[in-house]
Each structure stands twice: as C-alpha cells, then as structure tokens.
C-alpha cells in the first residue's frame, strides 16, 4: 500500500530543512519507541524529533489504520460524521479516516505540542479544518464524544493501571465505533486482549477482527493475533532506515467495537491462505475456536473465493 501523494509531498517538504539531522533524529526516535513502551515517558520534545517521527512512523501507521478501517466498515452501517483521534501524533490515523469516510468534524488530541504542530503543517493544504487540542490521556477528561473514536499505537505507552482507565474513558466518549490498534507483537496483542475483556464486560459488540464476542481462543502465552500491511517506502524513509527495499511490512494487532449489535461473520482468516496445487488451506478463527480448513476445486466458487482472500478477511 502506498500513502497518498499529498502526504508524501508534505513529509518531504517539512523534512527538507536540516536533512541530515532529521535522518539522525528518526533513528533516535525509533529507538526511544522500542525501549520506552509502557513507561509513560515523553518521547518527543523537539520539532526535529516530531518531523523524524513523521518520516519513520507516519506511512506505516497510515496504512495500518486504513487497513483496519477498510475491513471494519464492511460490517458497520451506522453514519460516522464526527471523529476523535486520541493520541493523534502527527495525524496519520486522521488522514486514513478522512480518505475513507466523508466526515463533518475531526478533532485530534495529543500530549506533545511539537507533534501537534507538525500535524497541523502536514494537513494545512488538505484538511485545514481539523481541530488540534492539547490532551493528556492519563490526566485530562476527553473534550467531547464522537461517532468514531480511534487510538493507534497509544495504549502501549501506558502502565497497566492507566491502560484500563484510558480504555474505559475512550469507550465513554464513543457514540458508535471505537478502534484500538497496537503493534503486532505478543505484548501488543496482550494489550488488545485487555481492552477486549474490559469492554465486553461493558456489553460492547466486536466488529473486527473477531467473529464472536466470546472468549478469545488464542493463548497469549503461546501465540498472538496480528496482521500486516505492506508499506511503500519513501526515498527519505530508505535513507532514515538505512534500507534498500522499496517497502516494509507493518505488523499490527487491533480490535474494533460498536455500541450497537453487529452481524458477525462465521469465520475470520488468521493467516495468509496457503495455496497448493488444486487446493488452498486456511487457518480460521470461528465461534467454535481455531479451525484449519482445506478447500479444493470440488468446492468450485468457494475455492475460487478463498484463493483471493487474505488474513483478516471474513469467510
């Protein structure tokens, strides 16, 4: 997946000043985010660090959010006119949302002033009416409710106690849909399971990726549920990450909740289908647990359909 051309141009524009320094900062920022998960520390304090964050993380975050929303909107038929992006960073999630949904009002809230400043710069041409507000998820009350509340790569920065409070707070601010996205790691999946447990107790309805509201059949001590999107790298990303490949794979775990009941699917594909000679094998999460099924040419249209599906798709 490629990010929108206008975002690519804006990132290149803001990174054109002090080019070498920005590349160095992007490497520092990546290290900070890897090593400070769950410690609640401020990770971005300078404008150059915020720009470096936009270079190193925005394309992948945009693509992950876009993938999650595209999948979730297939099952959700309520109107979404207002959006609240919590821990918005430099606005990647908001850009993904507005490329999929015709919104009337979008509010981006975040703790780091420099991140908000860079986010405004990136959106000044295409989304000038987005509101940006200072907000600390641990300390502040959420400013207002929205039809869609989204938080991406945020709760992994909180302690366990703060995560529970944050999840409950975000659910209270949700009129319709709540999206929570985390890194596609064992730890990220455990955070998703925490959110799942907390909100099912509050009678939330799962839109995606789960096919049911029952107990998750995956043992987090042995495995984890994650998906990925292939992200086209920009020229400056290649320089910042010292990579030659024209792409990177962004792995993510997620869960999406609805205030209203959802027509859930029978099964969700957990891994990319294994296509063999005349057959295809798929690993599925169903209401009865994890299943592995094989479809052959004898299954005709179903066989043809499954061959075209990917992890996260419903069956």
Residue ranges of model-derived segments:
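Conserved SAM-binding loop of SAM-dependent methyltransferases across substrates and taxa
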Residues: 90-102
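Class I SAM-dependent methyltransferase Rossmann-like catalytic core
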Residues: 41, 45-67
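Conserved class I S-adenosyl-L-methionine
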Residues: 79-89
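Conserved SAM/SAH-binding beta-strand->alpha-helix loop
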Residues: 112
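N-terminal auxiliary segments of SAM/dcSAM-dependent transferases
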Residues: 1-40
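C-terminal lobe and adjacent flexible extensions of AdoMet/dcAdoMet transferase-like proteins
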Residues: 239-315
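Conserved beta-strand signature within the Rossmann-like core of class I S-adenosyl-L-methionine
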Residues: 175-184
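A short SAM/SAH-binding and catalytic strip from SAM-dependent methyltransferases
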Residues: 147-161
């Amino acid at each position: 997946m490629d990010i929108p051309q206008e975002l690519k141009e804006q990132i290149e524009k803001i990174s054109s000043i002090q080019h070498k320094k920005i590349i160095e900062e992007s490497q520092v920022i990546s290290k900070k985010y890897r090593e400070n998960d769950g410690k609640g520390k401020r990770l971005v304090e300078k404008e150059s660090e915020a720009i470096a964050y936009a270079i190193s993380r925005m394309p992948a975050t945009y693509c992950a959010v876009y993938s999650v929303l595209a999948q979730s909107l297939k099952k959700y038929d309520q109107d979404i006119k207002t959006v609240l992006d919590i821990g918005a960073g430099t606005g990647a999630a908001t850009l993904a949302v507005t490329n999929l949904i015709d919104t009337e009002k979008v509010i981006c809230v975040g703790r780091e002033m420099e991140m908000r400043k860079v986010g405004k710069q990136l959106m000044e041409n295409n989304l000038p009416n987005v509101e940006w507000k200072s907000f600390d998820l641990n300390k502040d009350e959420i400013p207002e409710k929205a039809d869609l509340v989204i938080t991406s790569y945020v709760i992994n920065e909180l302690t366990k106690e703060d995560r529970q409070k944050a999840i409950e707070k975000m659910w209270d601010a949700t009129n319709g849909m709540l999206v929570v996205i985390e890194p596609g790691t064992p730890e990220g999946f455990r955070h998703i399971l925490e959110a799942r447990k907390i909100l099912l107790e509050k009678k939330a309805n799962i839109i995606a990726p789960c096919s049911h509201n029952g107990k998750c059949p995956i043992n987090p001590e042995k495995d984890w549920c994650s998906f990925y999107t292939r992200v086209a790298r920009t020229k400056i990303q290649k320089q910042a990450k010292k990579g030659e490949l024209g792409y990177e794979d962004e792995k993510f775990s997620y869960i999406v909740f609805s205030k209203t009941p959802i027509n859930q699917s029978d099964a969700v594909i957990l891994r990319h289908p294994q296509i063999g000679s005349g057959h295809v094998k798929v690993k599925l999460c169903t209401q009865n647990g994890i299943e592995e099924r094989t479809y052959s040419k004898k299954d005709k249209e179903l066989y043809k359909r499954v061959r075209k599906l990917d992890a996260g798709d419903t069956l």
